[in-house]
Amino acid sequence: MKCFNPHLEILSEVQQWVYPQLRNLKDLGFVLYGGSALALQLGQRQSVGFEFFLHGRLKQKLLRGACPLLGDESLVTQIQDSENTVTFEISPPDSGKGIATISFFGNLGYGRVGEPRLTEDGVLVVASALDIFATKLKGIIQRPSTEDFADIIRLIKSQESLLEALEAASILFGTDFSPMLALKALSYFDELKPPLSQVDASFLIEQVSNTLKNISVRNIERPSLSVNS
């Protein structure tokens, strides 16, 4: 597995406090996705939460064993609890640090396209930019947000291909994903709050137009989320 030097400076103060306590999660097969995964790789937009995905079923006893912090009721409040989704809100001893959330999603059997990467300090396994891109394209169809649009723009500007991300999402999510609906969603941003800048809006329109000329979907093997599982 390739390593990268994470942009820890982009994390909030409370996330930096939590970060080293997440080291054992990778041994259970957890892979970091979402805005924080992207921020660690690109060093740009700050995200206040960690989102961990797991290929298999979520087992809370093992989860709490790997991350004892989650069992400290003086610091942690569980705000969501379902069979394969749990979310915790963390307030460190120094309340001035703020609050962070950690979410865990299990039984995500759709696999991956890119190769996850390990932070050089050995703390986290992080999803590839392509896989994060694919999940964000699916997300904007259902729940468009300015944050996801901003992340997609950053991904494209960091040389990630919109066309390849559409192909990846089509393979990962099958009939639950429509490339054309994703492109339509990328072209409809008038109701986003806060709104996109005119520069970003024009950039997206140009990218969608260029992609429409070349869109296609290829078959790609779907291994599990983690390299070791």
What are these regions (language model features)?
Residues 1-229:
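Compositionally biased terminal segments of proteins
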